[in-house]
Amino acid sequence: AQDSRQAWQLYENGEIDYAACAKHINWLIESGVHGLLPLGATGEFSALTLEERKAFAEFAMKEVAGRVPVIIGAVSTNVDVTLEVAKHAASIGADGVMILPPPGLHPSQDEIYAFYKHISENVTLPVMIYNNPGSSGVNILPETLDKIADLPHMGFLKESTGDIMRLTRAVDELADRLVIFCGCESLAYESFVMGAKAWVCVLANVAPAQS
């Protein structure tokens, strides 16, 4: 299965061009993507206010209209913002939320576990654990992922270290608890060979049928 990390369009004044975004969403779905992930890093969530993020999530859910699953990006340096986005995503019928360790704060492994534990106690949707050292500044180690996978509401792992051995280990050790997603463009084929179930794909924004 292939999910598209959805990019979005802006007017020159910085406002979201919802008409262009609607056209893009429909094109992606008609081209065969199996899911959408709005408000991820590719979607430049950090350029939006909390209210703009909520408004875009509502727009995306309405435009998709149940045709494919939607996982909403809920990344923030502020855990309260992450939880607010996650709770809002649940209220509008999203299928899950993607959550990265707070970027730029360089938490320890114990702090990462405590973060996801707090998340698990305050969400109702399935959580996509996002392991991307390039974005967060920290690598969630296999031992920590093993503990996180046992928490309530943990449903998916997006593995974006760029290390096929890490993804292979995740499949071997976590696939009975989490759905493993490849999060690296250059390793999609290898990831499927090694047992990943899906690919969160940036390239699909411009070439969905070929991705």
Give residue spans per PLM region:
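Active-site beta->alpha loop and helix N-cap motifs at the rims of alpha/beta catalytic domains
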Residues: 4, 9-137
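Catalytic alpha/beta core domains of metabolic enzymes, predominantly
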Residues: 121-122, 133-211
